[in-house]
Amino acid sequence: MSTHREPHDRSTHSRGGTSRRSLLAGAGMLAATVPLAGAVDGLAVTPGRLTTSDHAVPGRAATPAARLRVVQVSDLHLKRIGGLQRRLLERIHESAADLILFTGDLVDSRAHLWQLEQFLRECPRQPRSFAILGNWERWAGIPLEALVRLYERHGVELLVNRSVEFEKDGARIRVTGLDDLVSGRPDVAAALDGMAPTPNHLLLAHCPAARDSLALPAEHPVDLMLSGHTHGGQIAPFGQALVLPHGSGRYVAGWYRDGGPPLYVCRGIGTSLVPVRIGATPELARFEWSLA
């Protein structure tokens, strides 16, 4: 169970994904909404605020073999290192995580790669840090090799349809990172090719709709799936997302445990298309995972 309940922390949502054209149409709704912002909490304009959510993730064993502290950073859409990004860096350092995960859309332009370089330089350097691609890295035309090298310089491993295994206090852990559902070609079979079953399996997919559209092999059950992409709707007065990007599926934010592996959808940090968040405060997600 989570120790911090998010506004969208529920098991089902009826909203489907939309295209970039629909996103722009939704941004137009902002003109009518923003003048009311701040009048009530549900309409608070919150692009510069930051919340931290903490979650306990149960494992397969009644008695955990070890515990893993995980931090998820998603959807930075990094354009500068300002006050929000400084607060985020402080909280990442304070978290003393065993594992830092970057779940896509860290930048949306080649012009901002140097800000990403600076941000990663100031992040704590952990023995294990992983990143996956989002839709914006591909839409921006950033060469994959350039991203791989940039991440490597700061101790982060980019996973594109690939799995990596490591140990924590004798417990074996697998992290599987998929290509983006919207802009790439996620391939679960390729990511798990030649892998033996493991008692602790973490799946990273930028778009949460991957949970419903990809076949996960029964011999490789997933204990925790982490996604971003939705921004919690970004413009979500009173907690109701007006528009969701294609690839969101039925997911907005928070926990989903029905009909698949336990999924957490992080609201992320930045914004896209319009530099405003309403009712969808930026989020750093932290997990304490009980390992089998």
What are these model-predicted stretches?
Residues 69-149, 154-157:
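Membrane-embedded segments
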Residues 18, 36-71, 79, 83, ...:
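C-terminal segment of N-terminal export signals and the immediately downstream linker at the start
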Residues 141-156, 162, 168-213, 277-278:
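Binuclear metal-dependent hydrolase catalytic cores centered on His/Asp/Glu-rich metal-binding motifs
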Residues 58-71, 164-175, 257-262:
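Beta-strand-turn-beta hairpins that frame and shape the catalytic cleft
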Residues 18-32:
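N-terminal export leaders
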Residues 1-18:
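N-terminal secretory signal peptides
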Residues 208-288:
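Conserved beta-sheet core of the metallophosphoesterase superfamily
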Residues 73-74, 100-104, 129-135, 159-161, ...:
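Active-site neighborhood of phospho(di)ester-bond hydrolases with catalytic His/Asp-centered motifs
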